Amino acid sequence: MTEPQARELIENYLEGYNLFDVGCMLSCLHPAVVFENIADGSVTLRTDGKAAFEAQATQAIEFFMERNQHMQSFHFEADRAEVGIEYFAITAIDWPNGIKAGTILQLTGQSIFTFRDGLIASIQDIS
């Protein structure tokens, strides 16, 4: 995969995420995609395969009234992209961890994408 192809694929994935369009997100993913959310050095969520990713992504929609991931930086090398992410969201419901509906979340982090067969093979969201 070339750098422009990787960037376009990630931009399409992020657009789907920002629009709550799970179908758009899935169209960018390899069938064996692995997703990990990593916070403070610990894996807090992991999905294996497109079906598990779809289930998690669909469930996550109800948690937000608005959400946006914006690409701040992009570095590509050998089928791997490191992307600096600026994240903004407003919660739609009270969360089990005590975060209340209407809470504004603003974070910066990094996402690492790998690619296989012209699709995203893995995503690590690191905050």
Regions found by a protein language model. Give the residues of each.
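A short gly/proline-enriched turn/hairpin at secondary-structure junctions
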Residues: 34-48
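Secondary-structure boundary/capping residues
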Residues: 22, 34, 66-69
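Short, low-complexity N-terminal intrinsically disordered segments enriched in polar/charged residues
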Residues: 1-32
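Residue-level preference for long, well-ordered alpha-helices that form the structural scaffold
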Residues: 2, 6, 49, 102-103
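Hydrophobic pocket/interface hotspot
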Residues: 13, 25, 33, 49, ...
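Generic recognition of short, well-ordered alpha-helical interface segments
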Residues: 8, 20, 48, 52-55
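Short hydrophobic alpha-helical module
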Residues: 16, 32-35, 60-63
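A beta-strand edge to alpha-helix "cap/lid" segment located at domain peripheries
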Residues: 54, 58-127
